[in-house]
Amino acid sequence: MQSTSLFLEGINLLTLGMGFVFIFLIFLVYATRAMSQLIVRFAPPEVPAKTTNKKASANKAKANPNQNQGELLAVLTAAVHHHKTQQKLS
């Protein structure tokens, strides 16, 4: 085979491959849109979430602000330790 013929075959294969990928991606977009419309049409309506009384939870938090100090200190210590070990590994 001559180099010109081989080059033209490569261009042909490139065009064919890119064409199939483009067609597949277009098909994928339309299939995704169709599935989305089916789900919206046949899915049950969302039930609104129950709301809690925010004033009651705020009052509980204000009643004892030092209650979780030990847990907070443990979490912060673990986070600092993890960060320092990650810095040593890098």
Curated annotation (Swiss-Prot):
Its EC number is 7.2.4.2. GO terms for biological process: sodium ion export across plasma membrane. It is found in: Cell membrane. InterPro entries: Na_pump_deCOase, OadG. The chain crosses the membrane at residues 10-32. Its cofactor is Na(+). Keywords: Cell membrane, Ion transport, Membrane, Sodium, Sodium transport, Translocase, Transmembrane, Transmembrane helix, Transport. It is an enzyme of class 7 (translocase). It catalyses: oxaloacetate + 2 Na(+)(in) + H(+) = pyruvate + 2 Na(+)(out) + CO2. Pfam families: OAD_gamma. It is a single-pass membrane protein. One of its GO terms (cellular component) is plasma membrane. Belongs to the OadG family. Heterotrimer of an alpha, a beta and a gamma subunit. Catalyzes the decarboxylation of oxaloacetate coupled to Na(+) translocation. This is Probable oxaloacetate decarboxylase gamma chain 2. It comes from Vibrio cholerae serotype O1 (strain ATCC 39315 / El Tor Inaba N16961).
